From Swiss-Prot:
This is Putative FBD-associated F-box protein At5g56560. It comes from Arabidopsis thaliana (Mouse-ear cress). Pfam families: FBD, LRR_At5g56370. InterPro entries: F-box-like_dom_sf, F-box_AtFBL13-like, F-box_dom, FBD, FBL13/AtMIF1-like, LRR_dom_sf, LRR_FXL15/At3g58940/PEG3-like. Residues 4-60 form the F-box domain. It comes from the Eukaryota. Residues 340-390 form the FBD domain. PROSITE patterns: FBOX.
């Protein structure tokens, strides 16, 4: 009979992987960790999560003792990541102490979840030159001291963070002098205009679509000024105001908005190469003279009844476009039929000289859609492949026959039904 291997008999390297993958502080696991065999590997664990979820109140003191005892190890190694997931209420001094010990262990990533409670920013972070990534989740920030700095922070995640006023968002961004990546998921509190002004920012991701939009007096939304930005991901179904300052370095953007504005929307992305756009705006969201001379790939969402007119405008503004994808990315249910497609009087330069790939997902074969498809096939002289994805599985269906019968100016174009 083979001898069974006990967990405590495993080599330190394997124990480190196991410890790093587990929430550390369930009482049963804590009891094992304080045994002599586990003390050595625990001090070497590079990824630690303090999670007090499901800790009974009577075991709270045991939990606190374990956390303090673990942190007070004198010979602990470098800590790559610390996650404080704290459902109970802790004093600012407790949190500051835990973060201080992590700073002493050269922590690189820090995440704090407080389940709606207020966080007093740990002052010890001001001296931490190793911290590169900070995530704040489900908490409230009421004070950002003028002297506070995060000197080496490259990535900041603000997830369901509640601020007391507009100025606090700008304040927390100002304390990050070398910030390159910002993620904002949900805006809470009394903030009306979220002002993102970060000269060093390279990557920005904003998701403001949780809950239902409600009427507010005045403007509510975002002002973005990030001249060094190269990658933008922006989803906002709640705001009524958007303003993008010039961002000449952006090469890739995924934008989904319902805000009905013009001229201050995607017109700032003049160097864009890859654009994915969903907009319910009834106006062209950039100045009439705008040219997207570097745009090679366009994905346009067809969930709005007005998408076809926006589509025609962008074709004229993107003379170098080589790949075009039409797709309904959302499950919105609009009662309005597709706005009447008006064929442009002049064929867009991208169709006559450059477009090679055309793809249409969720193609329904309505009269308006057929007119759009026919226009592209009849004018895209360089087209190599046109793919139509439909719910129809019958290759002899009338809808597919109509597509096959359409004139194709490009003899090299291959028609594909997916």
């Amino acid at each position: 009979m083979e001898k069974q291997t006990r967990l405590s008999d495993l080599p330190d390297e394997l124990l480190l992987k196991i410890l790093s993958a587990l929430p550390m502080f369930k009482v049963t696991l804590a009891t094992r960790l304080i045994s002599r065999r586990w003390k050595g590997p625990w001090k070497l664990v590079p990824d630690v999560t303090f999670d007090d979820d499901d800790i009974p109140f009577k075991s709270f003191e045991t939990f606190m003792s374990f956390v303090y005892g673990s942190f007070l190890s004198n010979d602990a190694q470098i800590l790559d990541r610390l996650h404080l997931k704290l459902n109970q209420k802790y004093s600012a001094s407790d949190i500051n102490f835990w973060v201080q010990v992590a700073v002493n262990r050269s922590v690189r990533e820090l995440r704090i979840d407080l389940f709606g409670k207020t966080l007093e920013l740990p002052c010890c972070l001001c001296s931490c030159i190793t911290l590169k990534e900070l995530t704040l989740h489900d908490l409230c920030i009421k004070v950002v001291p003028a002297w506070f700095r995060l000197p080496s922070l490259k990535t900041l995640h603000l997830l369901s963070v509640k601020f007391s006023s507009d100025g606090f968002v700008a304040s927390i961004l100002r304390i990050c002098p070398v910030l390159e990546r910002l993620v904002v998921d949900g805006t809470k509190g009394n903030v009306m205009i979220t002002n993102i002004d970060v000269p060093t920012l390279r990557n920005l991701s904003i998701r403001n679509s949780k809950g239902k939009g409600t009427y507010v007096e005045g403007s509510k939304g975002f002002v973005i000024k990030a001249p060094s930005l190269t990658d933008l991901n922006f989803e906002d179904t709640l705001s009524n105001f958007l303003m993008f300052e010039p961002m000449p370095e952006v090469i890739k953007a995924d934008i989904q908005v319902i805000c009905d504005q013009s001229k201050n929307f995607i017109g700032s992305l003049t160097s864009i190469q890859h654009l994915s756009l969903c907009s319910l705006t009834s106006k062209t969201p950039y100045p009439a003279c705008t040219v997207f001379s570097s745009l090679k790939y366009l994905e346009l969402c067809t969930c709005s009844a007005r998408w076809a007119n926006l589509f025609a405008c962008i074709l004229n503004a993107a003379p170098e476009l080589r790949s075009l994808k039409l797709k309904s990315k959302h499950k919105f249910n609009y009662n309005d039929p597709m706005t009447l497609w008006e064929e442009p009087a002049v064929v867009a330069k991208c169709l006559s000289e450059h477009l090679e790939i055309f793809e249409w997902r969720q193609y329904e074969g309505t009269e308006q859609e057929r007119n759009v498809a026919g226009y592209i096939l009849a004018n895209a002289t360089c087209l190599k492949m046109a793919t139509f994805s439909t719910r129809c599985r019958n290759r002899n269906h009338r809808m597919l026959k109509k597509l096959k019968s359409m004139d194709r100016v490009s003899k090299a174009c291959r028609l594909v039904f997916d």
